[in-house]
Swiss-Prot record:
<feature type="binding site">
    <location>
        <position position="10"/>
    </location>
    <ligand>
        <name>Mg(2+) 2</name>
    </ligand>
</feature>
<feature type="binding site">
    <location>
        <position position="134"/>
    </location>
    <ligand>
        <name>Mg(2+) 2</name>
    </ligand>
</feature>
<dbReference type="InterPro" id="IPR012337">
    <property type="entry name" value="RNaseH-like_sf"/>
</dbReference>
<dbReference type="InterPro" id="IPR002156">
    <property type="entry name" value="RNaseH_domain"/>
</dbReference>
<dbReference type="InterPro" id="IPR036397">
    <property type="entry name" value="RNaseH_sf"/>
</dbReference>
<keyword id="KW-0460">Magnesium</keyword>
<comment type="subunit">
    <text>Monomer.</text>
</comment>
<dbReference type="Pfam" id="PF00075">
    <property type="entry name" value="RNase_H"/>
</dbReference>
<dbReference type="GO" id="GO:0000287">
    <property type="term" value="F:magnesium ion binding"/>
</dbReference>
<feature type="domain" description="RNase H type-1">
    <location>
        <begin position="1"/>
        <end position="142"/>
    </location>
</feature>
<dbReference type="GO" id="GO:0003676">
    <property type="term" value="F:nucleic acid binding"/>
</dbReference>
<keyword id="KW-0378">Hydrolase</keyword>
<dbReference type="GO" id="GO:0005737">
    <property type="term" value="C:cytoplasm"/>
</dbReference>
<keyword id="KW-0479">Metal-binding</keyword>
<comment type="function">
    <text>Endonuclease that specifically degrades the RNA of RNA-DNA hybrids.</text>
</comment>
<protein>
    <recommendedName>
        <fullName>Ribonuclease HI</fullName>
        <ecNumber>3.1.26.4</ecNumber>
    </recommendedName>
</protein>
<feature type="binding site">
    <location>
        <position position="70"/>
    </location>
    <ligand>
        <name>Mg(2+) 1</name>
    </ligand>
</feature>
Amino acid sequence: MPKQIEIFTDGSCLGNPGAGGIGAVLRYKQHEKTLSKGYFQTTNNRMELRAVIEALNTLKEPCLITLYSDSQYMKNGITKWIFNWKKNNWKASSGKPVKNQDLWIALDESIQRHKINWQWVKGHAGHRENEICDELAKKGAENPTLEDMGYIEE
């Protein structure tokens, strides 16, 4: 029986574009692990995606996951839009290349071995774990140490 994991994620960006950070809380039974990383130049949407990717990549085996995020962009992208993007060679309905394609591909790869129940939570609404993730993401953005490879200035 696969492990049942809860994951909470958030991304933050100071300036958008600007320095950004990710925050995540992973919970298995009574155990919790937190992630916080900061990137020099990025966007809020890239940080929302990267938070989920980083959290999923810490798991060592296939799991049953309930994943909570306050990002409609991430949730809609991975549960609705990605199917047509892949069919259309990573082009949006406008015919233009999908933004953040590198991270969508990475996210698509990182979900394949898991069964995920995607949940949207309202941000800044007193949801304990979302608030923790928000703080972790802000902390990362305030102390960036990493390059967001794939970020393209517009």
